[in-house]
Swiss-Prot record:
One GO CC term, this protein: cytosol
EC number, as in UniProt: 3.1.1.29
Record's catalysed reaction(s): an N-acyl-L-alpha-aminoacyl-tRNA + H2O = an N-acyl-L-amino acid + a tRNA + H(+)
Catalytic EC class: hydrolase
Family to which the UniProt record says this protein belongs: Belongs to the PTH2 family.
GO molecular function: peptidyl-tRNA hydrolase activity
Subcellular localization: Cytoplasm
PANTHER family according to UniProt: PEPTIDYL-TRNA HYDROLASE 2 (PTHR12649), PEPTIDYL-TRNA HYDROLASE 2, MITOCHONDRIAL (PTHR12649:SF11)
Classification via InterPro entries: Pep_tRNA_hydro_II_dom_sf, Pept_tRNA_hydro_arch, PTH2
Organism this protein belongs to: Nanoarchaeum equitans (strain Kin4-M)
Protein's name according to its UniProt entry: Peptidyl-tRNA hydrolase
Keywords: Cytoplasm, Hydrolase
Length: 115
């Protein structure tokens, strides 16, 4: 069981802001799974709540991954910034997939590199 957060490298934002957005994505996706499939959430949590942060080079690639995950029934959380500090309102910063089965998520993200 794994949850993956994928970040678009192209954005010019500070490390602290990036960390906060990754945390938002991770929490949002976990809560979605908790509400809709508590058994899956509980198993992921019991197994150590594994999380991995990966990177892509473009917004298009990020959105393509989100679309493929949704088509496979994987929970997706898309994080848009409020735009109060470093980026324009609504800028997509990252997405989170899962938690779900490793094999299911790896079919979509297995070629991505760690952030």
């Amino acid at each position: 069981m794994v949850k993956q957060v994928i970040v678009c490298r192209k954005l010019d934002i500070g490390k602290g802001k990036l960390c906060a957005q990754v945390a938002h994505a991770s929490l949002d996706a976990a809560l979605k799974v908790y509400r809709n499939n508590k058994e899956l959430f509980d198993r992921w949590y019991r197994e150590g709540a594994k999380k991995v942060v990966l990177k892509v080079n473009s917004l298009e690639e990020l959105l393509d991954i989100a679309k493929k995950a949704m088509e496979k029934g994987i929970v997706v959380s898309i994080i848009r910034d409020a735009g109060k500090t470093q980026v324009s309102p609504g800028t997509i910063i990252c997405i989170a997939l899962g938690p779900d089965e490793d094999e299911k998520i790896d079919q979509i993200t297995g070629n991505l590199k760690l952030y």
